């Protein structure tokens, strides 16, 4: 049954994307937004990334580090020190908290563990369900989330918020940042609204998610845009399959904030304003798993097979 769910999920993604695939190299001149099955699509032209590249490199290294099986508290990754780790990276995705000189207290979640069935099943539980208002009371009316991701976040949420508040006080730190790869990127996305509601001090400095799948519907994407205050970014590398899944045709929608590295693993990156920008990753039809676990801002994020400990800007 477990294998069937995974196979069905991947088959649906492939079929729907083949049927509705956008043509390569969109050049249409149109208003900034138009409707796609009632959802927003941006035609805004790309811009330079809004922050210094070293900031994204530090985020990328911390997104990689939470995937490492061998680690110890107080390990250094760039300008950050590991403070806390939780989860078995099977039923519970590994969460790690760092103190970074440039980013504040950083929460990083590991990506899906392909060697553990519960991690795979959580990622395959793809149905959209209503947001749990106990955690997300400020989400827009009608907001829905990917069931497997919401369930995974709810398991870690009480511990996460408690430890986050503790380390903010311990380090007298007002900045909070969120990151992760893949499954972990989805949890960083979901955490944003819950963290903002529960902060006792400070604010969310940045959220930078790598290889982010679509996590919710249009109303969830709108909620991220509203509450992120322009500080949420997700990075797509080349033809990464995961960033294109689940398909929009199933009701899913990315929020604003895409940075697209194209070609993959290169130093050519641009910021694509608005939701589901046609000039960004959606403009090319292709599926690549190697691009998912690739090089982001000259920093490898390769899950179990990447640098451990993670390195910053050396790839």
Swiss-Prot record:
Keyword set includes Ubl conjugation: no
Name the record gives this protein: Secreted mono- and diacylglycerol lipase LIP2
Protein role: Secreted lipase involved in Dandruff and seborrheic dermatitis (D/SD) probably via lipase-mediated breakdown of sebaceous lipids and release of irritating free fatty acids. Shows activity against monoglyceride and diglyceride substrates and generates free oleic acid from the substrates mono- and diolein. Able to cleave the oleic acid from both the 1 and the 2 position of the glycerol backbone as 1,2 isomers of diolein were converted into oleic acid and glycerol.
Entry-listed glycosylation sites: 74, 265
Keyword Disulfide bond part of the UniProt annotation: yes
A Gene Ontology cellular-component term: extracellular region
Catalytic activity: a monoacylglycerol + H2O = glycerol + a fatty acid + H(+); a diacylglycerol + H2O = a monoacylglycerol + a fatty acid + H(+)
Phylogenetic lineage: Eukaryota, Fungi, Dikarya, Basidiomycota, Ustilaginomycotina
Pfam family, one: Lipase_3
Record-stated family: Belongs to the AB hydrolase superfamily. Lipase family. Class 3 subfamily.
Signal peptide positions (record): 1-21
Keyword annotations: Disulfide bond, Glycoprotein, Hydrolase, Lipid degradation, Lipid metabolism, Metal-binding, Secreted, Signal
Gene field: LIP2
Subcellular location: Secreted
GO-annotated molecular function: hydrolase activity; metal ion binding
């Amino acid at each position: 049954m477990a294998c069937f769910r995974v196979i069905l999920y991947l088959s649906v993604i492939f079929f729907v994307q083949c049927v509705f695939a956008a043509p390569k190299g969109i050049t249409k001149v149109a208003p900034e937004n138009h409707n796609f099955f009632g959802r927003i699509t941006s035609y805004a032209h790309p811009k330079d990334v809004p922050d210094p590249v070293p900031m994204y490199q530090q985020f990328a290294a911390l997104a990689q580090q939470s995937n490492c099986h061998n680690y110890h508290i107080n390990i250094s990754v760039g300008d950050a020190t590991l403070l806390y780790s939780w989860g078995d990276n099977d039923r519970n995705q590994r969460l790690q908290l760092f103190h970074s000189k440039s980013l504040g207290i950083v929460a990083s979640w590991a990506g899906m563990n392909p060697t553990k069935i519960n991690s795979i099943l959580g990622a395959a539980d793809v149905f959209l369900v209503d947001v749990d208002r106990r955690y997300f009371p400020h989400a827009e009316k009608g907001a829905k989330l990917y069931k497997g991701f919401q369930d995974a976040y709810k398991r870690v949420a009480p511990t996460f918020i408690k430890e986050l508040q503790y380390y903010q006080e311990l380090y007298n730190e007002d900045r909070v940042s969120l990151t992760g790869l893949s499954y972990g990127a989805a949890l960083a996305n979901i955490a944003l609204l819950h963290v903002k509601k529960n902060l006792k001090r400070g604010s969310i400095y940045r959220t930078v998610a790598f290889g982010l799948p679509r996590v919710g519907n249009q109303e969830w994407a709108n909620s991220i845009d509203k509450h992120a205050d322009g500080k949420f970014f997700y990075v797509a590398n080349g033809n990464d399959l995961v960033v294109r899944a689940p398909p929009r045709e199933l009701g899913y929608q990315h929020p604003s904030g895409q940075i697209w590295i194209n070609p993959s693993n290169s130093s050519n990156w641009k910021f694509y304003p608005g939701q589901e920008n046609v000039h960004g990753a959606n403009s090319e039809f292709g599926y690549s798993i190697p691009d998912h676990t690739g090089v982001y801002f000259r920093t490898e994020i390769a899950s179990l097979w990447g640098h451990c400990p993670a390195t910053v800007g050396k790839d």
